[in-house]
């Protein structure tokens, strides 16, 4: 692989280019009509069948029940059969962006009648899908070719008529092999993150499952922690600098995030300033899934407070035991025990006052806290590695395509 300049406009090569095994350059990229390398496939299904229904999304081709979370009921007459290794895309878009996905899931699958099915001939399918999904020039051109107002349509005829600079088949194969290795590495890392989180949930359930007091005595949460309501402020208090106000958006994956910060320029009493080892919790939100999200305040953070929809749980135990309890199923089962199917979008002090938790002796509790915190660090490092891999992939794609 070599960095190749194409700034003179004569040679069409990406900034990052592969070479032949003998070190020589591949031929320059040449303008090609997609219609020359696309072969449509038009077999459909009618009546009863045993095909899986797939959905094409920007996250890839997925089983419909995985995409929606449950099996959907549809009349599948006229759905398009998509053989293994063939490509599809949804021709309608709300923002002019389209996703091209290859069936690597099932030997017997169908997609909506709105999903055109085709295969690439004399071209590498993996390369072409990555190219169509990642090249800024491709995205821009396809958005222009799509027609419509609120929802635009990229017809199959328009797609086939589009022309792009493409490398020869041998170079496509090399780029595709490289991307497949990188994609496999990313998926392996993602699998590791999922496995670590699953194991952590198992640890939490094991530690915080003492409901009958056979192992440790239980206490009310209010006996070992204080609950502090957040700051109420008006839009006129918001400023470019001042006190940082922690909100639900500042909690991401169990840690603090500072991508979306709000500051207020007003006097904040000492009682409304966070301290090291505090637990910040989202206690009210329009989305129930966000209620109960927590993060540990890892260090002293001067000039930092929290919003009215948040709460600080301040432990009296001098360790992280309370933080881990607040992430356990034992805690959530008590908080939402009476919700049934109703949408409860807040946690009150009264609810927290009624929560109970097992309380081991000090030394045992510190061992538990250390074990769980060590595991949190493993998860954090694994997630950072995953993020770095995904950012590396994104940067490489910008340089691998013209």
For the regions a language model picked out, list residue spans one by one.
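Short amphipathic coiled-coil heptad-repeat segments
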Residues: 1-24, 181-221, 384-402
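A short glycine-rich beta-alpha junction/loop motif
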Residues: 10, 109-114, 147-170, 303-309, ...
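Non-catalytic DNA-recognition/assembly elements of restriction-modification systems
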Residues: 13-45, 161, 169, 210-231, ...
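Sequence-specific dsDNA recognition surfaces
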Residues: 35-87, 222-234, 249-279, 302
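Short coil/turn segments at secondary-structure boundaries
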Residues: 47-55, 144-145, 234-241, 338-339
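A short beta-sheet element
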Residues: 67, 78-136, 143, 247-248, ...
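Short, surface-exposed secondary-structure boundary micro-motifs
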Residues: 93, 178-180, 285, 371-373
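Short, solvent-exposed linear patches
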Residues: 171-174, 367
């Amino acid at each position: 692989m070599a960095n190749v300049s194409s700034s003179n406009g004569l040679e069409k090569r990406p900034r990052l280019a592969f070479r032949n095994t003998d070190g020589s350059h591949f031929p320059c990229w040449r303008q090609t009509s997609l219609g020359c390398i696309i072969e449509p496939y038009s077999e459909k299904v009618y009546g009863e069948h045993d095909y899986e229904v797939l959905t094409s999304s920007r996250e890839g081709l997925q089983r419909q029940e995985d995409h929606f979370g449950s099996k959907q009921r549809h009349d599948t007459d006229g759905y398009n059969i998509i053989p293994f290794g063939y490509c599809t895309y949804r021709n309608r878009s709300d923002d002019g962006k389209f996703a091209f996905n290859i069936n690597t899931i099932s030997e017997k699958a169908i997609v909506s009648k709105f999903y055109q099915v085709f295969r690439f001939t004399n071209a590498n399918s993996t390369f072409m899908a990555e190219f169509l999904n990642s090249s800024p020039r491709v995205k821009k051109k396809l958005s222009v070719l799509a027609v419509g107002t609120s929802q635009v349509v990229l017809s199959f005829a328009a797609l086939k008529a589009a022309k792009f600079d493409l490398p020869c088949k041998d170079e496509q194969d090399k780029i595709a092999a490289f991307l497949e290795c990188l994609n496999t590495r990313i998926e392996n890392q993602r699998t590791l993150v999922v496995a670590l989180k699953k194991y952590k949930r198992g640890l939490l359930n094991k530690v915080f499952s003492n409901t009958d007091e056979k192992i440790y005595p239980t206490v009310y949460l209010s006996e070992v922690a204080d609950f502090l309501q957040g700051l109420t402020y008006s839009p006129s208090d918001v400023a470019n600098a001042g006190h940082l106000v922690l909100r639900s958006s500042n909690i991401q994956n169990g840690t603090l995030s500072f991508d979306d910060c709000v500051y207020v320029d007003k006097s904040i009493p000492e009682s409304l300033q966070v301290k090291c080892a505090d637990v910040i919790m989202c206690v009210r939100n329009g989305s129930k899934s966000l209620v109960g999200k927590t993060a540990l305040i890892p260090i002293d953070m001067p000039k930092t407070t929290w919003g009215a929809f948040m709460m600080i749980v301040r432990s009296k135990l001098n360790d992280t035991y309370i933080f881990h309890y607040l992430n356990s199923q034992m805690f959530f089962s008590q908080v939402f025990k009476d919700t049934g199917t109703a949408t409860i979008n807040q946690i009150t002090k009264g609810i927290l006052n009624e929560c109970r938790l097992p309380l081991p002796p000090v030394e045992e509790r510190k061992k538990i806290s250390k074990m769980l915190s060590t595991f949190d660090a493993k998860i954090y490092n694994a997630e950072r590695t995953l993020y770095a891999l995904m950012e590396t992939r994104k940067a490489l794609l910008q340089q691998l395509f013209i």
